[in-house]
Each structure stands twice: as C-alpha cells, then as structure tokens.
Amino acid sequence: MIGLVATIIEQTTTAVKVSKANKQLEKKAYVDLHTGLPNKSKCEELFHTVEFIKSPTACIVFDMNNLKHVNDSLGHSMGDQLILNFARLLRNSVPAKDFVGRYGGDEFIAVIYDASRESIAAILTDLQKETEKFNNYGTHIKVSYSHGWALSTDYNECTLRTLFDKADKYMY
C-alpha cells in the first residue's frame, strides 16, 4: 500500500512538472519575451482561427519610425527600450478586450472587435495623446510611428488576414 501511494505521488509530481514545462514552452512559442505581447506566431494563429469575420472587426498595423536610426546611433539597447515603450503605450491605448501583438521587429498589430470608425479614431487619438505625453516627459528617445487600418464592414466575406494585408498596405 505504501508503495502504491509513493507511486501515485511520484506520478502526480511528474504530471505537474510536465504541465508547467508545457506552459513555459507555449509561452515561449507565442509570447514576445521582450514586450510580453503575443508574438508573430500567435498573430498568425489568430489569422488562421477566424475564417470569415461575422461582426465588425478592425485591424490596425503600426510600424515604428526611425528604429534603425536609434539602433545605429544610440545602440540596440536603446532601440529595445523604444520598442518596449511603444508596446506599453499601445497596450494601454487599446481596450483590454481587443488583441495587441508584436508582429515583427518594429511592427505591431491591434485587432479591434465590435469596431467602428469612431472606435478606431478613439483608439488612435488616445495613442497619439499618450505618445505625446511620453515624448514630452523628457525622454531623449522619442516614440514615433506610422499606422494603417482596415474595417471588415468595408469588404464582403473578409478574413482577418485580408484585413491585416489591407491595413499594412494603407500604412504607406
């Protein structure tokens, strides 16, 4: 009986360790370790999980300006800090119910659910105000970005991937 209890305890302990290891692996696979935001793999997974968008949804693509210049002139640690600052500003400006991710080096996306032109404008206005406050606070590296957006109600049978591609195109 004691041997059986010891075996059960050992198997339970092993199962808990495996579960924790799996969660850590999933986090590494889907979370940008620098910003804590979902990474490109998670963004791509989101694109594939939504076949056709049924409710008004928007995708906003953001591209940080001058990151290469900051990296080249002030060093990559300052560039990393700039990325982290923008990620925080963006996450704080987009409602918690919506998705924010880091798509690549200096590119971020926001997926806004139950979106309208007004809600998109409100998010972008809030982000601009927060960015101006941050830049006026006295930091020597300024946050600057470009953005483009697309709203599902403007297209028939639209996928999230289609919205992303259109928003990315509208950025330029």
Predicted segments with their positions:
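Conserved long alpha-helical elements within nucleotide-processing catalytic cores of c-di-GMP signaling
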Residues: 26, 30, 39-58, 65-95, ...
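A structural signal for short, well-ordered beta-strand segments
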Residues: 59, 108, 145-149
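S-adenosyl-L-methionine-dependent methyltransferase catalytic core, i.e., the SAM/SAH-binding region
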Residues: 156
